[in-house]
Amino acid sequence: MDIKVKDFEGPLDLLLHLVSKYEVDVYQVPIVEVIEQYLAYIETLQAMRLELAGEYMLMASQLMLIKSRRLLPKLVDKEPDEEDLEQELLGKIEEYSRFKALSQELASQHDKRALLFSKPKQELIFEQAVLQKDKTVMDLFLAFSQLMAAKQEAFKYNHTVIERDDYRIEDMMELIEARLELEQELTLTDLLKHCDHLNEAITLFLASLELIKRQLVGIEQTSHFGQIVLRKEIQ
């Protein structure tokens, strides 16, 4: 059977769990120890004759390569890409950590706002969004999380209790559509630039996803980790 390893969503989620136990910056963790724990966990599941999703095994092979290079006698200088492999892995874990924290914050905000309404609670719209142009919800979340990290200090000083009616997804959808009528295209950075409160930014982001889901707005990202561009779709 194909299993969901414990409560983990994928190999990065498992690695993040292992890294977080050290309670230090992700770049300070003893990487070989983390790799050994990951491999031990996977081996245990295999010993129990449980089938694993291929992504876990692919990550295991990459981790074994990093571990072997770390433990080889230093008879020669480091391979040019040896350190790059480690840094790339740690960077992915750090990105995933931000994505997961943001996802939890969005879910928390949704739950809090739902308490202010008598209508039945609805699932978060981004969970069912089907994006276009080979982009995924993860791409949008990563871009959004980077922008939110940059605005974290500003939000801290502008923290107030916002009533749900102050920021409504429907209103934000109209705002985005109006801006796209004037500007033709809009980056996610420009869209969120003037947000003073976290709730405002979150509502704008959810409104963007709803417009994309309804195929009223398209997105484009010309390079990995590049700007997310929103454009009005021609009906």
Swiss-Prot record:
Its main location: cytoplasm. The lineage of its organism: Bacteria, Bacillati, Bacillota, Bacilli, Lactobacillales. Component of a cohesin-like complex composed of ScpA, ScpB and the Smc homodimer, in which ScpA and ScpB bind to the head domain of Smc. The presence of the three proteins is required for the association of the complex with DNA. It is found in: Cytoplasm. The keyword Cytoplasm applies. It comes from the Bacteria. Pfam families: SMC_ScpA. Belongs to the ScpA family. HAMAP family: ScpA. Participates in chromosomal partition during cell division. May act via the formation of a condensin-like complex containing Smc and ScpB that pull DNA away from mid-cell into both cell halves. Keywords: Cell cycle, Cell division, Chromosome partition, Cytoplasm. The gene is scpA. The keyword Magnesium does not apply. This is Segregation and condensation protein A. GO terms for cellular component: cytoplasm. One of its GO terms (biological process) is chromosome segregation.
